[in-house]
Structures are given as C-alpha cells and as structure tokens.
C-alpha cells in the first residue's frame, strides 16, 4: 500500500510503514545527510549514495531543464512517469518478484500534473555490476534472461538492459534503473533484442511486437536515407 502526504512544498509518496524514509527525506531537506559516494553530478541530475541511521540508500534528485513546455503538455496527457514507476515497482515486488531494486520514496514539487523537481530514495544494492566483470558466464546469462522474462510476466520492462543496469548480488541477478513506461509488445521485444545485442542471448520470440519494431526501424532508416542521413 502506498501513502501520499504533503511535506513542505513536496507531494510525497511512500510505502505504508515507511516512516524511516520520511525521516531520511526530512534530513535531506535540512541538509543533514552524509554522502558516501557521488555517482552523478550534472546540472539537472544528482545521484549519490548516502549513509543513514537505517543503512545505505541511493538518493536521486532530478530537476529537468530542457523541453519544459513539451513535458508540461505530455504530463497532462500521460501523467507522471516516476509516479507510475513507483507504483509499478511496489506492485511487482508485492507479487513476489524481488529482482528489481526497491523504490522507497518519491517526492515531487509539481503544478497540476507537471513535476519540476523529483527526489527519490532507492534501494542500494551491494554487488558487482556486470560492466565490471571481465567475462559473463553462461550461468549468469541464463539468470539475466530469466530476470527479464519474469519482469515481462509481471507487466514491466527494463527499457535499457545494458551491463550497467544489472548487478550480481551473491548468486542472484538484480535489475536497476527500470522503465516506468507501459509494457507494450514492442518494448518487450526491444528488451529481448537488446539482450541478444549486449550478451548474445538469442531472441527466440518472434511475435507481433518483434515484427512491428523491426519494420518501424526499417521505415525510419528508409526515411533517413531519403534525407541523406546515415541509418541507425
């Protein structure tokens, strides 16, 4: 169950019995948090590892700076991307699929459905990123494939299953940085194609989503050639 509340000028979504995450968020607002490691620090995005009385967490602050008018109108039609991701993550984990990293708190400064600033508290997973592994074994490849196929069965997609978005925690594969977009057949097909591209995991599912994705790419490349551009 997810609870919505107001804290200062933020609309906050948190899981039931998530008072400790509210406390961590309030510490953030008071600049009372200990940063252990900085993962990203650019104009619109800050991602850090913080140490708290309750353990280590990922803290992400995102304040989009471009295409704000476009984002405003999209938000009126499509709603809030991160709020959808928060609800999807909660649902899938309650269904018993725990490979995806947990999403504990989402705080937003918004006007109507348009969000100017996001603050997120996310599970920190200790382990080895696949990008840091010199070689990926067949056993790990099998676990990667199963994790994505199980994710699809639970109505979510990765959106970008590259090596930086998987962590080997002990003997288990964990998935991070998931997509909150609708799990359409084409998006599921893209995940499977990306698994083959990144890991050599053969895609044996040639469904309507696969063919729509392939034909759409061919059409885009055809139009690019007409315009004198290189194909992608």
UniProtKB/Swiss-Prot annotation:
UniProt entry keywords in alphabetical sequence: ATP-binding, Kinase, Lipopolysaccharide biosynthesis, Nucleotide-binding, Transferase
Gene name of the record: waaY
GO biological process, one term: lipopolysaccharide core region biosynthetic process
Catalytic activity: alpha-D-Glc-(1->3)-[L-alpha-D-Hep-(1->7)]-L-alpha-D-Hep-(1->3)-4-O-PO3(2-)-L-alpha-D-Hep-(1->5)-[alpha-Kdo-(2->4)]-alpha-Kdo-(2->6)-lipid A + ATP = alpha-D-Glc-(1->3)-[L-alpha-D-Hep-(1->7)]-4-O-PO3(2-)-L-alpha-D-Hep-(1->3)-4-O-PO3(2-)-L-alpha-D-Hep-(1->5)-[alpha-Kdo-(2->4)]-alpha-Kdo-(2->6)-lipid A + ADP + H(+)
GO molecular function: ATP binding; kinase activity
Protein name: Lipopolysaccharide core heptose(II) kinase WaaY
UniProt keyword Nucleus, yes or no: no
Signal peptide as annotated in the record: none
Summary of the knockout phenotype: Insertion mutant shows reduced intestinal colonization of 3-week-old chicks.
